From Swiss-Prot:
The keyword Repeat does not apply. It comes from Methanocella arvoryzae (strain DSM 22066 / NBRC 105507 / MRE50). Keywords: Ribonucleoprotein, Ribosomal protein. NCBIfam families: PRK08561.1. This is Small ribosomal subunit protein uS15.
Length: 152
């Protein structure tokens, strides 16, 4: 698959096996996995890190296969969960880092362009999350308030 702002191809990777049910060797119950998800998220892990930790430490092949729900859905049912989607937060953090870099290095044209591309991705994601109802319609990204928004 191609990248968004370049003509290069993306990274190659192996595809996941298509299966709807967990493998026969997996013995944990659905409730146990959900408790582990909430516990792991409570230890300052992001939603993607939760899946990796459960895979590596506890041998959970795929949380969605076992529980029938995604990690964010499990967290929202239990009253926790991220206020903003993880991919949006990561892009905003990248934009903040680029802003700080450009404050010190005004003439760095390559990173000025990288900041423009990153903020374009943020705006595109915000538009998508407005349409799907994940973010409220009055939520707006602004570089000036981004650092305050992420620190909360």
């Amino acid at each position: 698959m191609a990248k968004m702002h370049t003509r290069r191809k993306g990274r190659s990777r192996s595809t996941r096996p298509v299966r709807k049910t967990p493998p026969a060797w997996f013995t944990m119950s659905k409730e146990e996995v959900e408790k582990l998800v909430v516990k792991t998220y409570g230890q300052n892990a992001t939603t993607s890190q939760v899946g990796i930790i459960l895979r590596d430490k506890y041998g959970v092949p795929d949380i969605t296969q076992v529980t029938g729900k995604k990690v964010t859905a499990i967290l929202k049912e239990n009253g926790t969960g991220p206020k903003l989607p993880e991919d949006l937060v990561n892009l905003i953090k990248k934009a903040i880092r680029l802003h700080k870099h450009l404050d010190e290095n005004h003439k760095d044209l390559h990173n000025k362009r990288a900041l423009q591309l990153t903020e374009s991705k943020v705006r595109r994601l915000v538009k998508y999350y407005h349409a799907t109802g994940v973010l409220p319609m009055d939520w707006v990204y602004s570089p000036a308030t981004a650092e305050i928004l992420i620190s909360r």
